[in-house]
UniProtKB/Swiss-Prot annotation:
Name of the protein in question: Secretoglobin family 2B member 2
Species: Mus musculus
Phylogenetic classification of the source organism: Eukaryota, Metazoa, Chordata, Craniata, Vertebrata
UniProt tissue specificity: Expressed in lacrimal gland.
Keywords: Secreted, Signal
Gene3D superfamilies per record: 1.20.920.50
């Protein structure tokens, strides 16, 4: 599952022509939308990309996989993503502002759940 998310992030980054720092915040928004288990939250995060019906269904299937695996899998995956995000390599690459925006997104998702 983690590999799938990484592949999707790389595809979105390459396909849309974003610089990695520009794609970082939208990626984490979609990622958290998936983890939320809330279809409306997921669709809200996907909306700026104007996804096709098939693309929405693909993200919904990923969301379903997380739901089937339960809270433990979600928590472990979030720990992994947090470890990667705040590794010395990422901290040296991303600006403090980008990291702050990602933290805000994480906090909102954890507080509000959508």
């Amino acid at each position: 599952m983690k590999g799938t998310l990484l592949l999707l992030a790389l595809l979105v980054t390459g396909e849309l022509g974003f610089q990695r720092t520009e794609a970082c915040i939208p990626f984490f928004g979609v990622y958290l939308g998936i983890l939320s288990g809330n279809r409306i939250g997921l669709h809200t995060e996907l909306a700026p990309f104007d996804p096709t019906v098939e693309e929405k269904e693909a993200f919904e299937k990923i969301q379903d996989c997380y739901e089937e695996e339960g809270l433990k899998a979600k928590t472990e995956d979030m720990k992994l993503m947090t470890t990667i995000l705040f590794s010395s390599e990422c901290r040296s690459y991303y600006t403090k502002e980008v990291l702050k925006n990602i933290l805000v997104k994480f906090s909102k998702k954890l507080t509000h759940g959508s």
